[in-house]
Design a protein with these regions (language model features):
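Nucleotide phosphate-binding/pyrophosphate-handling subdomain across enzymes
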Residues: 2-4, 12, 19-23, 102, ...
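Beta-strand->loop->alpha-helix junctions that form or flank phosphate-binding loops
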Residues: 31, 50-53, 90-96, 134-139, ...
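Extended acidic/charged loop-beta regions that coordinate divalent cations
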Residues: 56, 141-152, 182-219, 257-302
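Intrinsic disorder/low-complexity segments
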Residues: 152-184
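N-terminal leader/targeting and accessory segments in enzymes
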Residues: 1-94, 153, 247, 255, ...
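A short, gly/pro- and small-residue-rich
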Residues: 73-93, 206-215, 232-239, 268-272
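Walker A (P-loop) phosphate-binding motif
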Residues: 5, 19, 91-140
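Conserved beta-strand/loop subsegment of P-loop NTPase cores
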Residues: 212-215, 246-250
């Protein structure tokens, strides 16, 4: 399939482009303001990038237009897509349809710390040999790219493509349960900003995660949200999509998130926070600057972290990822 991505230089849409390319699609795109790190990533991936919103930038043979949320009605490219009756979809919906089915989606939501927490969680899974897929709102130094499909490949619907031949026997055997789950996790930075000009829901409601981290909640995005309550409603919609077999990892110190859970919750909740509160997961600072801390789970110390990052906020990001 050939895709044109409108708004391709945004951190989210650039990640969508990387995933589409890895899946074997032909990918091109256009944007107005193009600069690193996304411009560098797109160039390294060999993706054609055209400047500006002229409808001439969209190849006539594109099968689908993927629309970023930075584009509104009145944008020349958007108006031409609508006038021509071209097939279009939002980036969040494309991700939900093309990448997330069959995966254990781990969504990282919150006003602050999403990119850091998503990166830490992905790194932990990678270090554990899980080969996760991911979409991060930036290019993490550990990975060199903002998005990757990961090691998981769903079983083929064809004749036993997913079976492993036994050497010298011409027979096949199914992979072990553990092997079949390698790479099944997909970690996504889950943004509360709206999806597209035609879909004003928060992007994260598309992802239907098995596990959601709710890192914090403050008033933000004044251009689309009237007040904190409006953002809380979107977080409530996210909570409603997490199955009862999943988990919610919630900042136990955040009163706005407590109010979200009070609106309704059907999923087991594990709370995290710094020492001094009654949480499932606690960080006890060894160094006041956050460069060393003890991780405590249900009152039992399970290990000490020493790392180069500083600050209480980064300790909370790490604790959420570990939980």
């Amino acid at each position: 399939m050939k895709l044109h991505i409108l708004g391709i230089a945004g951190t989210f849409m650039g990640g969508v482009a990387a995933l589409a390319r890895e899946l074997g699609h032909q990918v091109e795109g256009s944007d107005q303001a193009v600069y690193p790190p996304m411009s560098t990533q797109l160039e390294q991936l060999g993706i054609v990038l055209r400047q500006g919103w002229s409808s001439d930038n969209i190849s006539a043979d594109c099968d689908q237009i993927v629309v970023g949320n930075a584009l509104s009605r009145g944008n020349p490219a958007v108006e031409q897509v609508l006038d021509d009756g071209r097939k279009y979809i939002s980036g969040a919906q494309w991700l939900a349809e093309q990448v997330l089915p069959g995966r254990d989606t781990l969504a990282v939501a919150g006003t602050h710390g999403k990119t850091t927490t998503t990166t830490i969680l992905t790194w932990l899974l990678q270090a554990a040999g899980r080969e996760p897929g991911f979409l991060i709102g930036g290019v993490a130094e550990d990975f060199g790219v903002s998005a990757r499909i990961g090691g998981y490949r769903p079983p083929s619907s064809g004749p036993s493509d997913h079976l492993l031949p036994q050497a010298g026997e011409g027979k096949t055997e199914r992979p072990s349960a553990a092997a079949s789950r390698v790479g099944r996790e997909f970690v996504v930075e889950a943004d509360e900003y709206d999806t597209a000009f035609f879909d004003k829901r928060s992007k994260f409601v598309h992802y239907r995660p098995l596990v959601a981290i709710l890192n914090n909640l403050e008033y933000d995005h004044a251009d689309i949200f009237a007040d904190v309550a409006a953002i809380q409603r979107q977080f409530h919609h996210l909570v409603r999509t997490v199955p009862r077999r999943g988990r919610l990892i919630v900042n136990g110190e955040d009163k706005h998130l407590a109010e979200v859970l009070a609106m309704g919750c059907w999923t087991p909740v594990e709370r995290f926070g710094l020492d001094g509160g009654d949480y499932d997961w606690t960080a006890r600072l060894v160094n006041d600057d956050g460069s060393a801390f003890m991780v405590v789970h249900e009152g039992v110390g399970i290990g000490e972290v020493r790392w180069p990052l500083l600050g209480r906020h980064n300790v909370m990001n790490a604790l959420a990822s570990l939980a």
